[in-house]
């Protein structure tokens, strides 16, 4: 009981001390002031009862209210009508701008359908001038047969390396500065050197689906006006990357172009028309993006295709597209393919699944054990090389049956691709090479010259390197940027490389006059 009394005594003393402290701080009137500023009337005043003033309390000094800060409120909350001609009209303009942006985006991504005239895509030039410009390339005398006659003259072993180095001592084109040679607008993804030997023509494609044709001038076309510009014609044929450009083997006036949007189109330079040869789809109507294509050596009317999803097909241009037989050669993207010139039924593929495979197109496998899919049959795998990282490219030498590949492991590997291939390929030569590209540079791909056993590949240190089929370096052609995509002229010692801004670098075997 005594302990309880002591506790109550201390509690009362604490209460008294706290009350005295509150009086000294003048905090007694704060609750009433808060209610007053909030607009809440004291219930005692509302009821008419008198409020007794306690004795001994100091009067509370009221402070002036701060000016209210303006806040944003909608007209609906304020109960006001909307200004139909003002703000409503502004909202309509905003909606119209959004609609126009959506329509423009849809238009940029729209796929070109059907047969068209190229002059309809080029508004800056006259139809007659365009026809006259490219009619000189409509020389139908050039064909695959002429190419094979050239090969027959090179059926002997390679000349000594020193002579090849002299042949590959190429000079950079200097009539125009490379900064002016924008063959396309975006990053170059495909290049083709037209086989004409009298006049140089280079065709390129970019990531936006634009195709450009550069009519190369060997000297300044107008010496009195040094500020003249290169003769480049561009038109947008596709909605996605241009993956491959080739010249028809039976008609050099026609160009074949393929794209990631699944389209395969021809470009006729004699009539300046583009025909749609194929819109690659599966049985469900899904578009199959074309990653690479090549004309068959057996039949110049047959085009072999690979896709971004690992499919493979052969398209006979004389038949309807729905007659194609789709096969599966990989579960992932096939980035590059190559047909063996000595065995046209043999095809090599480079895939994102880190393999280089050689296939026999004469044999079919209903359910390949290497695939996780059961949608398509496959061809028989003859030989395989397993890489540490993805394989970017494959290419066959025209004479000595060498197969070259390069990938993201910064190596170039050379294989003996003669008959009786082992099931597991092993490279004869391995070259350490800076060929791993990044996000903003097109994939670097080694390409053999079509009439010699030499190949070229871009170097991430801004150059084009040329090697023999035994890995002996012949040339190092320096450039100001990375010429990621390269293309040889099929007959002459001319080579071109394209960079990530649409510009090209041309090298020839004689200095410009």
From Swiss-Prot:
SMART domains: WD40. One of its GO terms (cellular component) is cytoplasm. WD repeats lie at residues 183-224, 237-277, 329-369, 386-425, 438-477, 478-513. GO terms for biological process: DNA damage response; regulation of DNA damage checkpoint. Residues 35-45 have a biased composition (Basic and acidic residues). Keywords: DNA damage, DNA-binding, Repeat, WD repeat. Disulfide bonds: none annotated. Gene3D superfamilies: YVTN repeat-like/Quinoprotein amine dehydrogenase (2.130.10.10). DNA-binding protein that binds to both single- and double-stranded DNA. Binds preferentially to UV-damaged DNA. May be involved in DNA-metabolic processes. Belongs to the WD repeat DDB2/WDR76 family. This is DNA damage-binding protein CMR1. It comes from Eremothecium gossypii (strain ATCC 10895 / CBS 109.51 / FGSC 9923 / NRRL Y-1056).
